[in-house]
């Protein structure tokens, strides 16, 4: 599946600073392991959308987080292999299509196209591999077979196959949650703890046997379709290898999704740890209230763009808060971002020596390399009034994706 056009990302002046990010598994900020893989690249996998509804600013903020991370790596001279999936076969998609009386494939295609447009508007660097679940069914089948062969999965009636949480000794290391919280989140976030016959309520579905009215693919263990978590396990490891630098997504994916996608890959491929970093972005609220379609308070990137808001201002509004925090979006925050952008553009005419400009860029690099500290980065640039020349402007484009 194709992604969206690449934005122009200029080279950045100054001295590279190793990127440090907060790792959910280790519960600390630590340096990203940028040891190149066999292809000389640093691997990053970010979970994509389930295309049953329009993506909103909360989704966009997550992808802006990992766009920032990739920009820091690129500015440091690393080659990045970025992979993102699309969960284009899943219950929410089928349910929404049935409710609206449309074909689930058509619904998925329409929402994927809208997402591509939003990402292009925001100058998000696209993944090299943009992979739908339907494209990767054979890869999922192979991984499910590996789990079965390893004794890490078992079959129940109706052709369903589940992976055992005790297949790896380290299950739970990624999210660091206690058992009670795992059970709560599992039930709330797509799990089926009450499924009769499961060895453990937390065992996750990796293959759903065929039901009438649902799409199905043939497999050695019967017709059916992939479970949610194993899709990402297969897509990521088939492109980035059994161990790679960063797995990312929203904070709501830490458990169960990232915990299980890591566990499935580790059990199937017999590796200790799938990703060096598990990185999670906070949620976005509108005027202090979590964005929800039922509340009618979703903010859409394409609507903001149609209303004449500069994409760079939208990025700055998101960057006003730290990526790991649950944070707010409002008309006032967007207006402040637009004022900031205007002010910076006026500063572009300021005369400053190359040495002075490079000093500002070095400070900006260091701040962003410290767990993508965008609030401090914006404060630094606000304080550089009159010090903005082309060297700094280019750094803003390369590191922040903000064009002045």
Curated annotation (Swiss-Prot):
Gene3D superfamilies: Anticodon-binding domain of a subclass of class I aminoacyl-tRNA synthetases, HUPs. Its EC number is 6.3.1.13. Zn(2+) binds at residues 47, 232, 257. It is an enzyme of class 6 (ligase). GO terms for molecular function: ATP binding; cysteine-glucosaminylinositol ligase activity; cysteine-tRNA ligase activity; zinc ion binding. Disulfide bonds: none annotated. InterPro entries: Cys-tRNA/MSH_ligase (IPR024909), Mycothiol_ligase_MshC (IPR017812), Rossmann-like_a/b/a_fold (IPR014729), tRNA-synt_1_cat_dom (IPR032678), tRNAsynth_Ia_anticodon-bd (IPR009080). Pfam families: tRNA-synt_1e. Binds 1 zinc ion per subunit. Keywords: ATP-binding, Ligase, Metal-binding, Nucleotide-binding, Zinc. Its cofactor is Zn(2+). A motif ('HIGH' region) lies at residues 49-59. The keyword Metal-binding applies. One of its GO terms (biological process) is cysteinyl-tRNA aminoacylation. L-cysteinyl-5'-AMP binds at residues 47-50, 62, 85-87, 228, 250-252, 284. A motif ('ERGGDP' region) lies at residues 188-193. GO terms for cellular component: cytosol. It catalyses: 1D-myo-inositol 2-amino-2-deoxy-alpha-D-glucopyranoside + L-cysteine + ATP = 1D-myo-inositol 2-(L-cysteinylamino)-2-deoxy-alpha-D-glucopyranoside + AMP + diphosphate + H(+). Catalyzes the ATP-dependent condensation of GlcN-Ins and L-cysteine to form L-Cys-GlcN-Ins. Monomer. Belongs to the class-I aminoacyl-tRNA synthetase family. MshC subfamily. This is L-cysteine:1D-myo-inositol 2-amino-2-deoxy-alpha-D-glucopyranoside ligase 1.
């Amino acid at each position: 599946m194709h992604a969206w056009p690449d934005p122009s990302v200029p080279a950045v002046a100054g001295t590279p600073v190793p990127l440090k990010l907060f790792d959910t598994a280790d519960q600390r900020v630590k340096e990203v392991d940028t040891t190149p893989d066999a292809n000389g690249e640093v691997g990053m996998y970010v979970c994509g959308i389930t295309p049953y509804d329009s993506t909103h600013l909360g989704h966009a903020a997550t992808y802006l987080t990992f766009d920032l991370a990739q920009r820091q790596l690129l500015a440091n001279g690393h080659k990045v292999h970025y992979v993102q999936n699309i969960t284009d076969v899943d219950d929410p998609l089928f349910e929404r299509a049935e409710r609206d009386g449309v074909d689930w494939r058509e619904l998925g295609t329409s929402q994927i196209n809208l997402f591509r447009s939003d990402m292009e508007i925001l100058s998000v660097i696209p993944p090299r591999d943009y992979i739908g679940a339907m494209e990767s069914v054979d890869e999922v089948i192979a991984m499910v077979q590996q789990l079965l062969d390893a004794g890490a999965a078992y079959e129940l009636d109706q052709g369903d196959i589940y992976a055992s949480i005790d297949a790896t000794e380290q299950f739970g290391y990624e999210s660091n949650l206690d058992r009670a919280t795992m059970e709560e989140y599992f039930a709330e976030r797509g799990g089926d703890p009450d499924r009769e016959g499961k060895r453990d309520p937390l065992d996750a579905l990796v293959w759903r046997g065929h039901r009438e009215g649902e799409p199905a693919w043939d497999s050695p263990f019967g017709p059916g379709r992939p479970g949610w978590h194993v899709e990402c396990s297969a897509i990521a490891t088939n492109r980035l290898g059994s161990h790679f630098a960063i797995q990312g997504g929203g904070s709501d994916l830490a458990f169960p999704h990232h915990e299980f996608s890591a566990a499935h890959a580790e059990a199937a491929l017999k590796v200790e740890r799938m990703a060096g970093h598990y990185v999670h972005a906070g949620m976005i609220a509108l005027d202090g209230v979590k964005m929800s379609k039922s509340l009618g308070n979703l903010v859409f990137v394409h609507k903001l763009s149609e209303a004449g808001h500069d994409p760079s201002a939208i990025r700055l509004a998101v960057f006003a808060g730290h990526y790991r925090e649950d944070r707010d979006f409002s008309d006032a925050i967007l207006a402040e971002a637009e004022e900031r952008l205007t002010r910076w553009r006026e500063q572009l005419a300021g005369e400053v020596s190359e040495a002075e400009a490079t000093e500002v860029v070095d400070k900006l690099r260091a701040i962003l390399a410290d767990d993508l500290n965008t609030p401090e980065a914006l404060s630094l640039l606000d304080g550089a009034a009159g010090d903005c020349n082309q060297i700094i402007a280019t750094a803003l484009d390369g590191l922040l994706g903000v064009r002045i």
